Amino acid sequence: MPSLPHRCSVLLSFDLEEFDIPNEYGANLNGEEQLQVTRNGMQQLLPLLDQLQAPATFFTTAHYALQNKQQVKALAAAGHEIASHCLYHSRFDEKDILQSREILANISGQPVNGFRMPRLASIDKNLVKQAGYTYDASLNPTWLPGRYNYLQQPRTVFRSHDLWVMPASVTPRLRLPLFWLAFKNLPLSFIKQCSLAVLKKDGYISLYFHPWEYADLAGYTNLPFYTRRPCGNQLLQKLSAYLQWLKSLGHFTSFSNYIHLHENQLLHSS
């Protein structure tokens, strides 16, 4: 395999959203509980990011931001990127694409350049472009049974509808995904092996997780085991080991900063 590029980039992202996944499996969590579980996860997660000095991109629902304005302002002030995860996580209207961007920009004081559709659902990129975004991060170019099949889509950053499309990383040949469920359920040694293959091939890696994963989810027994365990501190320790290893191989950067630094190269290769 080829050697690692001199400066690998780690694009770390979190979907900062309501903890509504139990309701997909028959629960009836109210809105405040959904928000509080995510807050609990953020309390666990943020000290780790501070310790590692790891800037991340937080794809944030405008609803969460409106209920947690000081936290979102603090994220922006700490050097993290605030991007849009639409208005709500559980329901969608086309007008939410623009409205969420305006709300998040107003709260964070940052330009909001990026969009990620909840549950990585398909989205008309013309709508994303018209709402003023410069990139879309709604693509996981793999096959996830019951959710989506994007095996024919490009694996790495590409241009479409005058937008940058920022896929989540998958391995070069088999397209094994490196998203949150894989990280939660597979051995760290295997995740590192797959990550190394991506870094050697692509020169960067794009990852996404959820803050609520780092809260205590033991009581949500209606969730499938593979989405619920490990969680809390146990999962945080695994994430810590993984991120420290990635830091030894490269540097953390936001999605917008990666595009800014590599735009000429990306345009040439698109």
Residue map of PLM features:
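Active-site-adjacent pocket scaffolds in enzyme catalytic domains
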Residues: 4, 22, 106, 110-204, ...
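C-terminal domain-boundary segment and adjacent tail
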Residues: 2, 48-52, 188-270
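Conserved, mostly hydrophobic/aromatic
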Residues: 15, 49, 58, 85, ...
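Short catalytic/ligand-binding loop motif for oxyanion handling, primarily in non-cytosolic enzymes
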Residues: 20-21, 65-68, 91, 123-126, ...
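Metal-dependent polysaccharide deacetylase catalytic core of the NodB/CE4 family, i.e.
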Residues: 52-124, 133, 138-139, 170-172
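Active-site beta->alpha N-cap acidic-glycine motif
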Residues: 2-78
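The substrate-binding groove and active-site-proximal loops of carbohydrate-active enzymes
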Residues: 30-36, 60-61, 86-91, 112-113, ...
